[in-house]
Amino acid sequence: MASPHRLETEEAIRDLVKRIRRVAVLGIKTEEHSDQPAFYVPEYLHSVGIEVIPVPVYYPEVKEILGQKVYRKMVDVPGELDLVDVFRKSKDVEQHLDDILAKKPKAVWLQAGIRNDAVADRLAAAGIDVVQDRCLMVDHRRYA
């Protein structure tokens, strides 16, 4: 039986997209990479009034992205998170699982081209909504 936390219907995606206000972006890129989805998707979210919290994997010297303080781990981000938007290769998502589970966001979104069913199952079992292999910017434009 499919988990109710594995969001796969258009209705479930629409409902999630409409309620996000605060998003941590795991694997965000810097302004120097403005042509890459890991920068321009969070830039779009920021431009429509969603609070974007940068959690880059690289760029140890960077202190801010999109004018927001950078955090190195999900658990270090203060306050609740509506969503963690993940820009990591499918095979690399699992190395962030414990950090994401410890933070307990309401939902996790694996961007277009990113799918890891083992991670999605663990998140769903913890009561965290999961979307895989979809672009948050495309779905936000469509439904919000």
Predicted segments, located by residue:
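Structural/interface elements that position substrates and couple domains in central-metabolism enzymes
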Residues: 2-88, 94-144
